[in-house]
């Protein structure tokens, strides 16, 4: 596993931890007033993440860590094993339960097959967990695509969210082979998604690369849905193709569901720029850094 593979994983985790302080704060004026410019980790401002502290993850990052642990223990992605680990984790979870999580758990509790219990949520967050898989399938694109789609469907069984997982799996794989992020995204779009419903959302983001981030994400929508989150994530990848740290800070400053957007952008930008692009403090001050380092070293 190369430095860039490792950075793809760390970039996604750092994006989530950076988002925690202002996650789901939609009024950017409040962000400015309370924090100024968010360049490091903060305790959460909203009540959604009660009990969390600076350096922790949102519930998205927590799930990505469960995925990394499952994949590391299995030496690959085992769909049923991850489903069971995910269910067990939430049995005692003290953090926020979003609607996708609640619906998936309800389906499991109702007796559905663990791997066929996904909600119908169209939130981008289901695809955003996938960075953990980059460390496992660094040399096998088809397995990365398969695993990314399967882990998404576990909780977000929406066609466009699943297709987004495939899109990002193919894109990040190309970036890890040396292709620049925008070129990789454009080729993936042309080769595999030209007639797909997500194509227009990806293109919107790519075409906005020269525009102000806060204004652009406000226009796309700060919400969790793929309609808002996918073009937002693509904007970040295109605009900050040479500057991961600034991109993730600007993502947080744009408000709303900064975590899902940021995790995917952090993955792709990390894959391109490597570990030196991630501020050292973001690693050192991350609560789960030791555990992540241990898991990655075993792959």
What kind of region is each of these model predictions?
Residues 1-299:
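Structured, active/binding-site neighborhoods that engage oxygen-rich ligands
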């Amino acid at each position: 596993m190369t430095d860039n593979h490792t950075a793809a994983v760390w970039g996604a985790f750092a994006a989530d931890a950076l988002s925690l302080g202002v996650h789901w704060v939609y009024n950017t004026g409040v962000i400015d007033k309370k924090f100024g410019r968010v360049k490091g980790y903060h305790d959460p401002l909203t009540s959604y993440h009660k009990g969390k502290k600076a350096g922790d993850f949102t519930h998205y990052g927590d799930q990505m860590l469960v995925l990394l642990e499952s994949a590391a223990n299995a030496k690959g992605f085992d769909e049923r094993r991850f489903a069971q680990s995910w269910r067990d984790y939430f049995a005692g979870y003290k953090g926020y339960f979003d609607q996708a999580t609640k619906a998936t758990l309800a389906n499991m509790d109702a007796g559905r097959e663990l791997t066929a219990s996904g909600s119908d949520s169209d939130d981008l967050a289901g695809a955003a967990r996938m960075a953990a898989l980059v460390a496992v399938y660094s040399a096998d694109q088809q397995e990365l695509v398969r695993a990314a789609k399967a882990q998404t469907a576990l909780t977000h069984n929406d066609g466009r969210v699943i297709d987004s997982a495939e899109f990002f799996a193919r894109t990040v794989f190309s970036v890890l082979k040396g292709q620049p992020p925008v070129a990789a995204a454009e080729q993936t779009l042309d080769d595999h998604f030209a007639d797909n419903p997500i194509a227009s959302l990806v293109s919107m983001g790519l075409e906005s690369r020269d525009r102000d981030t806060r204004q652009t994400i406000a226009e796309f929508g700060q919400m969790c849905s793929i309609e808002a989150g996918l073009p937002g994530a693509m904007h970040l990848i295109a605009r900050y193709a040479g500057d991961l740290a600034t991109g993730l800070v600007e993502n947080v400053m744009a408000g709303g569901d900064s975590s899902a957007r940021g995790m995917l952008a952090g993955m792709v930008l990390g894959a391109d720029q490597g570990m030196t692009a991630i501020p050292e403090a973001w690693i050192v001050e991350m609560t789960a850094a030791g555990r992540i380092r241990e898991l990655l070293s075993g792959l």
